[in-house]
Amino acid sequence: MSRYTGSIYKKSRRLGFSLLENNKEFNSGKKRTYGPGQHGNKKVKLSNYGQQLVEKQKLMFLYGLNDRQFRRLYRVALGRPGVLTLNLLQVLESRLDSLVYRAGFAPTRRAARQLVNHSHVLVNNKKVNIPSALVEVGSTIALKAKSLEIPLIKNTLNKPADFIELIDKEKKVAKLARLPERNELPADVNEAYVVEWYNRLM
């Protein structure tokens, strides 16, 4: 399964979940705030399998992953001590593209992924252009000096997440101070269903 590159608005409405994390897709000014298609406004009772699938898709589309990438990260979470459901979310948030977004350096996760892909990002003062790279606690994340003039970056004024320490606001330097707690992550995801899904397959 390839990574989804279609309309975020349509996918958010279908899942009933804001992939932009700001509910912009469901604003009352939008033409439609329900799922796309002829029967998009009908409520359907999902089976346990259907619920697992929806919750897995929420995380896959939120973090811009395909199934192979998600399985790999699930195995990483499985190998860590602690609660598997929280481990999974923490691993997802430890991806470089996610941290660039959480640091407030990009307006969306997609934009953050593009910044990493185009070699605008440094981790511990070394260029890293792999969005899926996992960043360890204590590592610094920064944008290259020449990248600071890019309009997308200059116009992004998002506040960093609480688990990100902003070292230099002007030069766009931050540090992953700690792993996030569950209450700092998307509330409208039931990650227990995702664990059930992969426990059944692996």
Curated annotation (Swiss-Prot):
Subunit structure comment from the entry: Part of the 30S ribosomal subunit. Contacts protein S5. The interaction surface between S4 and S5 is involved in control of translational fidelity.
Keyword Ribonucleoprotein attributed: yes
GO biological process terms, semicolon-separated: ribosomal small subunit biogenesis; translation
PROSITE patterns in the record: RIBOSOMAL_S4, S4
Function as written in the Swiss-Prot or TrEMBL entry: One of the primary rRNA binding proteins, it binds directly to 16S rRNA where it nucleates assembly of the body of the 30S subunit.
GO molecular function: rRNA binding; structural constituent of ribosome
Organism: Ureaplasma parvum serovar 3 (strain ATCC 700970)
Name listed for the protein in its UniProt record: Small ribosomal subunit protein uS4
UniProt cross-references to InterPro entries, sorted A to Z: Ribosomal_uS4, Ribosomal_uS4_bac-type, Ribosomal_uS4_CS, Ribosomal_uS4_N, S4_RNA-bd, S4_RNA-bd_sf
Key words of the record: Ribonucleoprotein, Ribosomal protein, RNA-binding, rRNA-binding
One term under GO cellular component: small ribosomal subunit
HAMAP family: Ribosomal_uS4_B
Domain S4 RNA-binding: 94-157
Family indicated by similarity: Belongs to the universal ribosomal protein uS4 family.
CDD domains, A to Z: S4
